[in-house]
Curated annotation (Swiss-Prot):
EC numbers: 2.1.1.372
Protein name according to UniProt: Histone-lysine N-methyltransferase SET9
Role this protein plays: Histone methyltransferase that trimethylates 'Lys-20' of histone H4 to form H4K20me3.
Organism lineage string: Eukaryota, Fungi, Dikarya, Ascomycota, Pezizomycotina
A single MF term (Gene Ontology): histone H4K20 trimethyltransferase activity
Region annotated Disordered, chain positions: 260-437, 484-516, 601-662
InterPro entries, A to Z: Hist-Lys_N-MTase_N, Set9_fungi, SET_dom, SET_dom_sf, Suv4-20/Set9
Bias (Basic residues): 647-656
Reactions accelerated catalytically: L-lysyl(20)-[histone H4] + 3 S-adenosyl-L-methionine = N(6),N(6),N(6)-trimethyl-L-lysyl(20)-[histone H4] + 3 S-adenosyl-L-homocysteine + 3 H(+)
Signal peptide boundaries: none
CDD domains named among the record's database cross-references: SET_Suv4-20-like
Biased composition (Polar residues): 304-326, 355-379, 398-437
GO cellular component terms given for this protein: chromosome; nucleus
The organism's place on the tree of life at top rank: Eukaryota
Length: 662
């Protein structure tokens, strides 16, 4: 009986297997080969292997792949490294080990000299972070299968697709145009980004293999793109950020209604190369009106003199300045609700001045006569917002307590009995008004019970203590209710703080309004003082350099290429037997920065005492009188003296008598 067709089919790799293989291989063979950024991994729990070292991996690829073009020996040497060896030996079956070696070879062969493309990066989609991209190294013809740009395809279920989308790892998902099934492709082909007018397309070579074929001619330095799907970036790709949509100002690049689109191009920013000199005062005035996105500054000057001293001086001056209005010092409710950002800085608390005996006595008498309240004296003006508590001096508090004990009645019955009904009504009205206008500071600064108990017993004996009545008097009851309400409000606030905060998770963050070219020459990437936008002297691309005290001559892509192949980008190998260009394999012997003259020219500085170039010297010689070097001048003088006995002025030379023969 003939075997069934399903039995002859090879078992496909699962999503977990392909993700594990691809993560460690991109980490070892891309990130650790002079790559200036990192490739996004498929698993959030992946951590780079400690056994993968950049010098070791780069040396193997340069010796075995770039120079010898031997993939078998490169594969064997790579599997002897600590990181890859540990992962390879951890695989259980021979089938898994064979699949891992095949996937390893897909990444190794991209470093062959005949590979027409290379892995680069772009910040078009997120501005602040770089993602992998594919750039052509030579011209590619139409309908040409792009060599070594291949991968493996894995069909995923809807549940797996939802899990990948929730983790924001759906950057390699494609939808088949025939079967309409969703699949995830891994390998070097996953570095190709999406474009609505792509210059290449994905093709299936086997039941799991894919390759990329050019649909139109591709020039050197152009990004190789494919089409992911019609509705991959929302409905009708309404959130697409590709180059075609940027040029046509559509989808995510579409400007808002009522706004004029501003094309932030590189040519526009560099067209204003020459301008008249202006004073620094004019620059400071007109600097606020300049938009960084319209006229970007490649090397902004950020002063490093913003020290702690200036900040502290500004804070102390703002605190101590007495000329500020009272309304400007009032804090809003939002400011009071949130804690300060710098809790280490303590606010300076003022001390209440010591009130004299006569003034305190007068204020206490008036307060006791008008209101009849026992609680406290209102001695400070009313303020709308609470201020920090101020601790009074002990002497002042004792004096106030003495005066209160002498003048203010203790028993509410005695006060009620001694007063007439008119006085009672006036006391009630004045008490209510005083309670309404009482500030929080006055309530908080009540004398403590310990201070009252510490008074001499002789003074305490003079006061007759009367037990409180069963029915409380109106002013006392009003004050107690007011305090209880405040305490209840504080208790409610404390309870509210203890409640857990509810966080509403958003599936997608709010879309940011993008403008064409906002990812180039943008100040968002210049987060440090010595960061600058630099233009590569080889490929004319712009890149951000950190610690740009000395300007680099090449971009990270050109530097990586020269370190691996020993030639200037995009050359990878000798053109023929007559090619005499030197191949420098030790990248440490190459000076990667600009010379002093070019450095001054880039920074728009004058070259004081700088040596002129050969072309400038040749032009000066042709325009002016002939110049001679030291050796040339000596030779010229010697020849003239030998030919004639005249001086340069025309007079005859006199020979010294010591040199004459006797």
């Amino acid at each position: 009986m003939a075997p069934s067709q399903t039995a002859n089919k090879k078992p496909r790799m699962t999503l977990a297997q392909v993700s594990a293989y691809d993560d460690i291989l991109t980490d070892a063979l891309v990130d650790h080969v002079f790559y200036w950024t990192t490739v996004p991994k498929n698993r959030t729990s992946y951590h780079p292997s400690r056994g993968v070292k950049e010098e070791e991996i780069s040396k193997i690829l340069q010796e075995e792949v770039v120079l010898k073009k031997d993939l078998d020996s490169a594969e064997k040497r790579l599997l002897t490294t600590n990181g890859l060896k540990r992962f390879h030996n951890g695989l259980k079956t021979d089938k898994e080990k064979d699949d891992f070696r095949k996937h390893l070879r897909r990444y190794v062969q991209i470093y062959l000299p005949d590979c027409p493309w290379e892995v680069s990066s772009t910040n078009r989609y997120t501005i602040v972070s770089h993602e992998a991209a594919v750039t052509a190294r030579r011209a590619i013809r139409r309908n040409e299968a792009i060599k070594y740009l291949s991968g493996v395809q894995v069909v995923i279920t809807p549940e797996e697709e939802m899990a990948i989308s929730s983790q924001k790892k759906d950057f390699s998902i494609v939808v088949s145009s025939r079967s309409k099934c969703t699949s995830l492709f891994m390998g070097p082909a996953r570095f190709a980004n999406h474009d609505c007018d792509a210059n290449a397309k994905l093709m299936r070579t086997s039941h799991a293999g894919i390759e990329i074929v050019a649909t139109r001619p591709i020039d050197a330095g152009e990004e190789i793109t494919v089409t992911y799907g019609d509705n991959y970036f929302g409905e009708n790709n309404c959130e697409c950020l590709c180059k075609t949509c940027e040029d046509l100002l559509r989808n995510a690049w579409e400007p808002e209604e009522g706004t004029v689109p501003v094309q932030t191009g590189i040519g526009q920013s560099l067209s204003d190369g020459y301008s008249l000199r202006r004073r620094r005062r004019d620059d400071s005035i007109s600097g606020s009106s300049r938009t960084p996105s319209v006229t970007p500054d490649m090397r902004p000057r950020i002063t490093k003199a913003n020290s702690r001293g200036s900040l502290l001086a500004r804070d102390t001056s703002s605190v101590r300045s007495p000329s500020i209005d009272q309304t400007s010092r009032k804090r809003t409710h939002d400011v009071l609700a949130t804690p300060p950002k710098t809790p280490a800085k303590r606010q300076k608390l003022g001390v209440q001045p010591i009130v004299s005996d006569s003034s305190s006595r007068g204020t206490s008498v008036t307060a006791s006569e008008s209101s009849g309240a026992v609680e406290t004296d209102v001695t400070s003006p009313e303020k709308e917002t609470p201020e920090p508590m101020q601790t009074p001096l002990k002497g002042a508090s004792k004096k106030q307590n003495n005066e209160q004990s002498r003048l203010a009645p203790v028993s509410p019955q005695s006060t009620e009995g001694s007063r007439s009904p008119q006085q009672k009504n006036g006391a009630l009205s004045s008490n209510r008004s005083s309670l309404d206008t009482m500030s929080i500071q006055a309530i908080l600064n009540d004398p403590l019970e310990s201070e009252v108990e510490s008074e001499p017993e002789s003074k305490m004996k003079k006061v007759t203590v009367v037990p409180p009545p069963v029915e409380p008097v109106a002013p006392i009851a009003t004050s107690i209710e007011a305090v209880e309400e405040g305490q209840a409000a504080d208790a409610e606030q404390s309870k509210r703080k203890k409640q857990p905060r509810r966080v509403h998770k958003e599936d997608t963050p709010p879309a940011r309004v993008r403008t064409p070219g906002d990812y180039l020459l943008t100040p968002l990437l210049l987060s440090e003082p010595e960061m600058a936008w630099i233009q590569c002297t080889n490929c004319d691309e712009y890149f951000v350099q950190q610690n740009a005290y000395f300007t680099r001559a090449s971009c990270p892509r050109c530097e990586r290429h020269s370190k691996l192949y020993g030639y200037i980008w995009p050359k990878t190998d000798k053109a023929g037997p007559n090619d005499k260009e030197e191949r420098i394999l030790d990248h440490r012997t190459i000076h990667r920065f600009l010379d002093p003259d070019n450095e001054r020219r880039v920074r728009n500085r004058k070259s004081f005492g700088a040596s002129k170039t050969n072309t400038e010297e040749a032009e000066d010689v042709e325009r002016g009188r002939k110049r001679f070097g030291t050796a040339g001048l000596m030779g010229r003088n010697a020849s003239t003296t030998e030919d004639s006995g005249h001086r340069r002025s025309g007079r005859l030379r006199r020979v010294n008598s010591r040199f004459l023969d006797p």
